Design a protein with these regions (language model features):
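Short linear interaction motifs
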Residues: 91-119, 172-189, 270-271, 348-352, ...
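Short amphipathic alpha-helices and their capping/turn segments at secondary-structure boundaries
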Residues: 56-59, 108-122, 189-199, 274-283, ...
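Substrate-binding cleft and catalytic face of glycoside hydrolase catalytic domains
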Residues: 68-88, 122-306, 324, 329-338
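Polar, S/T/G-rich
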Residues: 1-79, 93-94
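Noncatalytic carbohydrate-binding groove/subsite architecture in carbohydrate-active enzymes
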Residues: 249-288, 293-473
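Generic structural hydrophobic/aromatic packing signal, biased to beta-strands
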Residues: 1, 33-35, 52, 68-70, ...
Length: 473
């Protein structure tokens, strides 16, 4: 019997029987193991050697963690609480998702450890990837992927939606192996959600686009030339050519048509999100659901009416997800930290739009979602000798980092170019039009959240605000 050293554990019944009721300690705060009637004849009539791995949270960080995201997510059976095997060679059994001996699967061992090390854990996000194959919005297909198109005698068959292994997207090779793991099977996702809920944890389902564009591709790039960047960030999916590139359809009806193809094509974004929501519903529901994340290259595309068609589609998708998932599920979109607060045209016009406000104010959206990687330091190695302009004593100056949450880069100043960053030539953030510098300060969440938002077009601020209501989400 294993006692994990909790503050509520009771005395072991064998020890209590030997020492008498009320005389046996519970050893609360101490982890220990009791063996009863162990058959020593199997070990030469002497105690065998035992080996234990003891884990406990050290310091404040692990004990303060309340939520985690399970990444990278690209694992065909890694989310399965049950062991899965195949037979790569006749007669040779291989465990696919069990690389340990202390639990039935890697998932079970990992979650057991996570809960032991993070006692205040309440919420887990499951990252669920499908694979995009093109940065051109109108040509990008989003499909479930596998690392091999066949498997020999699998104990659990891989299937996603109605796609079998033989029909799935084959993930490209990088070096000696696949560039990514595969999409988790539907069966494993449902089992993972149910297992997390059985552990008393809340669950977020996080649909995620991974871009499988190999280095040797010859795809036209939205940003110019032939050959798209290898394994790019999903935030670079955009119209073709991209805004600012010669011949771009941005601000025309054609841009809207390309976005429409991305969302509603045979392998479009709507199909992806609907399937993820269906999985959540089949698993008995989830506590939160994301409409994806960091698709800033799409949310910034304008049509011929200065509207943002992908944002309109996100609003429709939010309503569709609400219909599937019900009122008890929180829904949002994980906007990039450089995306959530608005869109500033880079064409010299000075146009400024709070382009995501229709989404943030939509009744199906419960919260403002931000993938937050805002810079908190501008530390250089030379600062050890020459001093840091922001008063940092070291790269790990906690007081300095705390100050930079509402100051520094993205609040007081910005770097106008790569050269400016290299030389630390800082430009102040100011608003000469309406005296509202917060519209350009991505770090100034409080002002963005507390004020009405007015779009700007052709050098003038609109007289009517957007649909955003301060403090509403």
């Amino acid at each position: 019997r294993v006692y994990r050293g909790t503050d509520t554990q009771a005395p072991d019944p064998l020890i209590e029987a030997k020492q008498g009721a009320g005389n046996a300690p519970a050893y609360r705060g101490t982890a220990y193991v009791v063996f009863e009637r162990i058959p020593l004849d199997r070990f030469g009539n002497r105690l065998p050697q035992f080996q234990f791995e003891v884990m406990r949270p050290v310091g404040k960080v692990a004990q303060s963690v309340r939520a985690v995201a399970l990444i990278p997510g690209s694992t065909e059976f890694g989310l399965s609480p049950d062991p899965v095997s195949d037979e790569p060679i006749a007669g040779q059994k291989r465990w696919i998702n069990r690389n340990i001996l202390r639990a039935r699967s890697d998932w079970t061992a990992s979650l057991d450890e996570l809960q032991a090390l993070c006692p205040d854990l309440h919420h887990v996000a499951i990252v669920l990837p499908w694979f995009g194959d093109d940065l051109r919005a109108g040509s990008c297909r989003i499909r479930p992927g596998v690392t091999a198109l066949s498997a020999r005698k699998p104990s659990q068959v891989w299937k996603v939606e109605n796609v079998t292994r033989a029909d799935a997207h084959l993930i490209s090779r990088s070096g000696d192996g696949a560039a990514y793991g595969g999409t988790p099977s539907d069966q494993s996702v449902i089992a993972a959600i149910r297992d997390l809920k059985a552990r008393g944890l809340k669950v977020t389902l996080y649909p995620f686009i991974m871009m499988d564009v190999p280095p040797d591709n010859q795809l036209p790039s939205p940003y110019g030339g032939i050959g798209q960047p290898a394994y790019p960030w999903r935030g670079r999916i955009t119209c073709h050519p991209a805004a600012g590139v010669a011949g771009s359809p941005d601000k025309t009806a054609v841009a809207g048509e390309q976005v429409q193809a991305f969302v509603d094509g045979p392998w479009g974004y709507r199909r992806f999100l609907n399937h993820c929501a269906d999985l959540a519903q089949q698993a008995g529901g989830v506590d939160a659901f994301l409409l994806g994340s960091e698709l800033r290259g799409l949310t910034g595309i304008r049509d011929g009416q200065d509207s943002f068609p992908f944002v309109t589609h996100l609003c429709a998708l939010a309503a569709e997800m609400r219909a599937i998932l019900g009122s008890g599920c929180q829904i949002t979109y994980g906007a990039d930290w450089s995306e959530y607060f608005g869109y500033q045209a880079q064409d010299g016009s000075g146009d400024l739009f709070f382009n995501l406000d229709p989404l943030w104010s939509h009744p199906a959206i419960d919260a403002i979602g931000i993938d937050n990687y805002m810079p908190l330091a501008d530390w250089r190695d030379s600062d050890l000798d020459e001093g840091n302009p922001d008063g940092f004593e070291t790269a790990y100056d906690l007081d300095g980092l705390t100050r930079q949450v509402v100051s520094g880069e993205g609040y007081d100043w910005y770097y106008a170019s790569v050269e400016d960053r290299e030389t630390r030539r800082r430009s102040p953030i100011a608003d000469g039009l309406a005296g509202k510098p917060w519209v350009y300060r991505y770090k100034d969440l409080e002002s963005w959240w507390s004020n009405r938002h007015y779009n700007r077009l052709a050098g003038a601020e609109a007289t009517q605000p957007t649909a955003w209501v301060p403090h509403s989400k």
